[in-house]
């Protein structure tokens, strides 16, 4: 595939959506064909599954069904959106991907790592991010940001309700993934100003990909 696949990961309130928007605008100004998308979601079917997951409805059926729903959404997303876009040479920016599943569902040992690995293999079909930005902030800071966003939107999703201890465990799990795959991950301190973070991401893109993508 001639395109380039970039994912953004991190806990709640780290600013992924904002940074994706800023990077997409910058890359388009540089003349690149850019697609922004998200998980779960990205297609009509996957967005319907997203609603089920984030509303907490899937919790009624247990963690295995939750993971199966995520896998179904990812298969549809990759097949209908990500793979075709990469084949067309686009830069794909995705808000969450496989690493979020590894962290959010992986910390729930009731499913089992072997089941997660099999479902991951089936869903990905050989497609993995070329570059992953991990936006990292202390869990307490992330929750404070998420609370502010929630007040503005007057909504709260299932995963944002988790307590501070769990959020910090997820943060550490993301950092561990970054240590295991240093060639793919770039950890960004997301406690600073939005513009400073955006510039760091732009600099990394120049170093890593912009000379490679036609």
UniProtKB/Swiss-Prot annotation:
Source domain of life: Bacteria
Entry annotated with the keyword RNA-binding: no
Entry keywords, A to Z: ATP-binding, Kinase, Nucleotide biosynthesis, Nucleotide-binding, Transferase
Catalytic activity: dTMP + ATP = dTDP + ADP
UniProt-listed CDD domains: TMPK (cd01672)
Top-level EC class: transferase
InterPro entries on file: P-loop_NTPase, Thymidylate_kin-like_dom, Thymidylate_kin_CS, Thymidylate_kinase
Positions contributing to ATP binding: 10-17
Enzyme Commission identifier(s): 2.7.4.9
GO-annotated biological processes: dTDP biosynthetic process; dTTP biosynthetic process; dUDP biosynthetic process
Gene Ontology MF annotations: ATP binding; dTMP kinase activity
Signal peptide residue numbers: none
Family classification: Belongs to the thymidylate kinase family.
Known function: Phosphorylation of dTMP to form dTDP in both de novo and salvage pathways of dTTP synthesis.
Database matches in NCBIfam families: DTMP_kinase (TIGR00041)
Protein name according to UniProt: Thymidylate kinase
Source organism (scientific name): Bartonella quintana (strain Toulouse)
Record lineage: Bacteria, Pseudomonadati, Pseudomonadota, Alphaproteobacteria, Hyphomicrobiales
């Amino acid at each position: 595939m001639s395109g380039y696949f970039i994912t953004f990961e991190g806990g709640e309130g780290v600013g992924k959506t904002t940074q994706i928007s800023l990077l997409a605008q910058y890359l388009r100004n540089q003349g690149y064909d850019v697609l922004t998308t998200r998980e779960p979601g990205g297609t009509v079917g996957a967005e319907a599954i997203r609603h089920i997951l984030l509303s907490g409805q899937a919790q009624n059926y247990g963690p295995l069904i939750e993971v199966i729903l995520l896998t179904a959404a990812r298969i549809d997303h990759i097949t209908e959106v990500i793979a075709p876009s990469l084949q067309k040479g686009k830069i794909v920016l995705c808000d969450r991907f496989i690493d979020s599943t590894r962290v959010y569902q992986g910390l729930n040992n009731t499913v089992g790592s072997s089941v997660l690995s099999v479902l991951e293999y089936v869903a990905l079909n050989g497609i993995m991010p070329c570059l992953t930005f991990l936006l990292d902030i202390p869990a307490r800071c992330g929750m404070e940001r998420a609370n502010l966003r929630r007040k503005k939107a007057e909504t709260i999703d299932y995963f944002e309700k988790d307590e501070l201890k769990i959020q910090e465990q997820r943060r550490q799990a993301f950092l561990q993934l970054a240590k295991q795959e240093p060639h793919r991950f770039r950890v960004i301190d997301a406690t600073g100003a939005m513009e400073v973070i955006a510039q760091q991401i732009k600099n990394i893109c120049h170093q890593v990909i912009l000379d490679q993508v036609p």
